[in-house]
Amino acid sequence: MFVLSGYEYLLVFLIVCSLLPILALGASALLAPKRRGSLRRSTYESGMEPFGQAWIQFNIRYYMFALVFVIFDVETVFLYPWAVAFHRLGLLAFVEALIFIAILVVGLVYAWRKGALEWS
């Protein structure tokens, strides 16, 4: 019988994760049509003929909303494992999570007061 230890599973996982993208790119290169021309080098805009410049300046408000979203998305990533193991972690972990949430609330209040969340 073939039995793997914990590290051997990790090695197999890393090998498979390395080979899958290589195989996908190789299959794409082999199966893709080999047409060359100006149409292939043009930009793609939702199936429509491109118009105007491809490089435009975005309003800074988009970046502010994206930054606030990323901050609270990362908060979710950190708090989910804590919530899953909450009953085993004890009071110290609860206090640490409250401090973490308080720091994020202070950041949210700061962004709100500075007008980063208002579009007008």
From Swiss-Prot:
Catalytic activity: a plastoquinone + NADH + (n+1) H(+)(in) = a plastoquinol + NAD(+) + n H(+)(out); a plastoquinone + NADPH + (n+1) H(+)(in) = a plastoquinol + NADP(+) + n H(+)(out)
Disulfide bond residue pairs: none
Ranges that cross the membrane: 10-30, 64-84, 89-109
Cellular compartments annotated: Cellular thylakoid membrane
GO molecular function, one term: quinone binding
Superkingdom in the source lineage: Bacteria
GO cellular component, one term: NADH dehydrogenase complex
Membrane topology: Multi-pass membrane protein
Protein's UniProt keywords contain Membrane: yes
Enzyme category, top tier: translocase
Keyword Cell division: no
Single GO BP term: photosynthesis, light reaction
EC number: 7.1.1.-
InterPro entries from the UniProt entry: NAD(P)H_OxRDtase_bac/plastid, NADH_UbQ/plastoQ_OxRdtase_su3, NDAH_ubi_oxred_su3_sf
Pfam families per the UniProt record, alphabetical: Oxidored_q4
Record family assignment: Belongs to the complex I subunit 3 family.
Subunit structure of this chain's protein: NDH-1 can be composed of about 15 different subunits; different subcomplexes with different compositions have been identified which probably have different functions.
Function: NDH-1 shuttles electrons from an unknown electron donor, via FMN and iron-sulfur (Fe-S) centers, to quinones in the respiratory and/or the photosynthetic chain. The immediate electron acceptor for the enzyme in this species is believed to be plastoquinone. Couples the redox reaction to proton translocation, and thus conserves the redox energy in a proton gradient. Cyanobacterial NDH-1 also plays a role in inorganic carbon-concentration.
UniProt-recorded name of the protein: NAD(P)H-quinone oxidoreductase subunit 3
